[in-house]
Amino acid sequence: MILYPAIDLKDGQAVRLVHGEMDQATVFNDNPAAQALEFVAAGCEWLHLVDLNGAFAGEPVNAAPVEAILEQCKVPAQLGGGIRDMATIERWLDKGLARVILGTVAVENPDLVREAARAFPGKVAVGIDARNGRVATKGWAEETDVMVTDLAKSFEDAGVAAIIYTDILRDGAMKGPNIKATADLARAVSIPVIASGGVSSLEDLIALRDCGASLNGAISGRALYDGALDLKQALAALKG
């Protein structure tokens, strides 16, 4: 199972939110590229980047720090937030991004997801952010009637590389991930699932790894910044 350190970008800085509330942002590093290099030095194999402003604006906002990370870090990175058309997908992949994460458009324009997955095999993931089992879009600001598993299954044959499943009520709360919901989703689809939201300790990571659903990976942010999770130790434990 791959551990993805998260760098959430707001106003050019690396921050963490609680439950996705933009007014509850804690700045952890005003130099996101330096933060990324710290994670790489600790041995991470991937980086998970989110353009928070972009998620609300519907277009890239924090392009400069993302580009700096891509230029300076030699590990693959995935990015979500504000990627809602083919031109933006192509632009990011041309700049060296390994994988785009499509969230809002997966609900509003699923054909774009399928088109992108066909055009760029292995480089398109679907981000499913949920509150109480229902999908939320536009930076988690809008809740839909779409159920998580229904949305995931609709992309079963689309060729997407992964589903990144975030439980909004767990995100940034340091209360542990929603292991049951994540495992249920992973069992329901053949697409690799990456867990996000609530990972707060090494025990949480081990529980996800051992949940019996063959998760592809887990994303952690606040726990790494707060020191509740030691990245080197976590990477070693997951390899072991």
Swiss-Prot record:
GO terms for molecular function: 1-(5-phosphoribosyl)-5-[(5-phosphoribosylamino)methylideneamino]imidazole-4-carboxamide isomerase activity. The keyword Isomerase applies. Its main location: cytoplasm. It holds the Pfam family His_biosynth. CDD domains: HisA (cd04732). Keywords: Amino-acid biosynthesis, Cytoplasm, Histidine biosynthesis, Isomerase. It catalyses: 1-(5-phospho-beta-D-ribosyl)-5-[(5-phospho-beta-D-ribosylamino)methylideneamino]imidazole-4-carboxamide = 5-[(5-phospho-1-deoxy-D-ribulos-1-ylimino)methylamino]-1-(5-phospho-beta-D-ribosyl)imidazole-4-carboxamide. It is found in: Cytoplasm. It comes from the Bacteria. GO terms for biological process: L-histidine biosynthetic process; L-tryptophan biosynthetic process. The active site is at residues 8, 129. GO terms for cellular component: cytoplasm. Pathway: Amino-acid biosynthesis; L-histidine biosynthesis; L-histidine from 5-phospho-alpha-D-ribose 1-diphosphate: step 4/9. Its EC number is 5.3.1.16. Belongs to the HisA/HisF family. This is 1-(5-phosphoribosyl)-5-[(5-phosphoribosylamino)methylideneamino] imidazole-4-carboxamide isomerase 1. It comes from Ruegeria pomeroyi (strain ATCC 700808 / DSM 15171 / DSS-3).
